[in-house]
């Protein structure tokens, strides 16, 4: 299964996969043409402001196999291994050559620590090739007081983006960027419908490519390609196998999904930030621009990194029901404990409704380092009954 020939024969999908596989290409061309690029670390950096300023947002990502020469000098080994790999590219000059500035949101506790390390590193070793850094300090509790505080925080970030761009950003430009992002999210929802329907036609691996390519290219161009993929996929073969929902660690490439799909499962959804959660909520044009951005990022489905256990239980129940998944795979990397705290209560809730779960916790990264993992996936999938529908 995984990425099939029918998908690769689609010119639109092939174009998205080329961006996904060669993530620096568009940004390099953008800078060559005189544009500016802003790197994003954390899933709560508002693209709308960056796009409104005429700059290109790109996601900071790991590089499997890259020696962590600089990281080992500064970070403890108990950091999330993916974040350690991301830190290496920030500190060794890789991103200093590729982006003009770096925006960091406090999406996880480990990313907050990364920001503090970078801030101190820029202070005591200013010769290090670290790009200019801005930190977005959201409050994640959903009440009016915190909403006002978040609006003030985003006003400060807006001023920073204006400084990076060398010009002011108007409310009209933010609203226009919000509309562009909304169109992109709608196109991705149309794609997701072809995963979640009774006869799914897009694999989880293919979906990761379609979604993840948005992090490295111009947004309107991505929307057009996604819509063409949706049209092409109507004729792709129907997928057969137990319907599985994936939750846990972000998957920045398709390697792990390919293992699960090779075991015979159909991944119909996920709640991590390189998947479905990224396009979960729209920018509301009826609000003032800053409030609309706050609403969009703060009222998305709850993340395991910044939510109470009860909130995560309800959120996962909703997502599993929406995807009509037959089972749930929990998968977390070593030193990424937050999601594992939710698991006992989530397992209890799901299994009380007849939805089996499998937990893979404290896993080595990258996934191929886990001996016998493919066999464990096959064993779990073999216990599941049925095919493309639940119930």
Language-model segment annotations:
Residues 52-77:
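Anionic-ligand anchoring segments at beta-strand to alpha-helix junctions in alpha/beta enzyme folds, i.e.
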Residues 309-354, 358:
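C-terminal hydrophobic structural anchor segments
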Residues 2-36, 151, 155, 159-280, ...:
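A charged, amphipathic alpha-helical module
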Residues 43-44, 49-61, 247-319:
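Redox- and metal-dependent alpha/beta enzyme cores, enriched for Fe-S-associated oxidoreductases
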Residues 85-163:
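Acidic/His-rich segments in extracytoplasmic proteins that coordinate ligands and/or metal ions
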Residues 75-93, 304-318:
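Glycine-rich, highly charged phosphate/nucleotide-binding loops
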Residues 2-6, 344-391:
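Peripheral docking tails and interdomain loops at the edges
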Residues 2, 18-27, 31, 35-43, ...:
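Metallocofactor- and cofactor-centric catalytic cores in central/energy metabolism, strongly enriched
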């Amino acid at each position: 299964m995984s990425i099939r020939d029918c998908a690769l024969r689609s010119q639109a999908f092939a174009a998205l996969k080329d961006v996904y596989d060669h993530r620096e290409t568009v940004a390099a061309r953008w800078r060559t043409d005189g544009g500016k690029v802003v790197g994003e670390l954390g899933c709560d950096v508002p693209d709308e402001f960056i796009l409104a300023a005429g700059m290109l947002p790109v996601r900071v990502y790991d590089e499997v196999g890259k020696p962590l020469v600089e990281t080992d000098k500064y970070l403890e080994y108990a950091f999330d291994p993916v974040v350690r790999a991301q830190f290496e590219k920030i500190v060794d000059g890789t991103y200093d050559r590729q982006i003009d500035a770096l925006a960091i949101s406090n999406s996880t506790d480990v990313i907050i620590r990364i920001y503090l390390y970078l801030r101190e590193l820029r202070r005591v070793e200013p010769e290090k090739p670290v790009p200019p850094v801005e930190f977005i300090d959201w409050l994640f509790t959903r009440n009016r007081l915190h909403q006002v505080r978040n609006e003030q925080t985003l006003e400060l970030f807006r001023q920073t983006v204006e400084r990076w761009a060398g010009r002011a950003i108007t409310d009209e430009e933010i609203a226009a960027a919000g509309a562009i992002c909304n169109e992109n999210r709608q196109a991705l929802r149309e794609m997701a419908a072809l995963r979640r329907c009774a006869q799914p036609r897009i694999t989880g691996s293919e979906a990761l490519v379609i979604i993840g390519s948005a992090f490295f290219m111009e947004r309107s161009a991505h929307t057009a390609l996604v819509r063409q993929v949706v049209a092409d996929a109507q004729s792709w073969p129907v997928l057969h196998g137990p319907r599985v929902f994936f939750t846990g660690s972000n998957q920045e490439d398709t390697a792990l999904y390919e293992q699960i799909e090779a075991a015979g499962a159909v991944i119909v959804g996920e709640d991590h930030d390189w998947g479905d959660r990224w396009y979960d909520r729209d920018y509301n044009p009826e609000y003032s621009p800053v409030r609309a951005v706050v609403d969009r990022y703060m009222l998305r489905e709850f993340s395991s990194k910044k939510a109470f256990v009860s909130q995560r239980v309800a959120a996962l129940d909703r997502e599993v029901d929406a995807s009509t998944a037959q089972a749930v795979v929990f998968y977390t990397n070593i030193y990424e404990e937050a999601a594992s705290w939710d698991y006992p209560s989530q397992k209890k809730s799901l299994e009380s409704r007849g939805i089996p779960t499998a937990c893979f916790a404290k896993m080595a990264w990258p996934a191929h380092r886990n001996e016998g993992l493919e066999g464990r996936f096959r064993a779990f999938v073999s216990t599941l009954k049925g095919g493309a529908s639940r119930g």
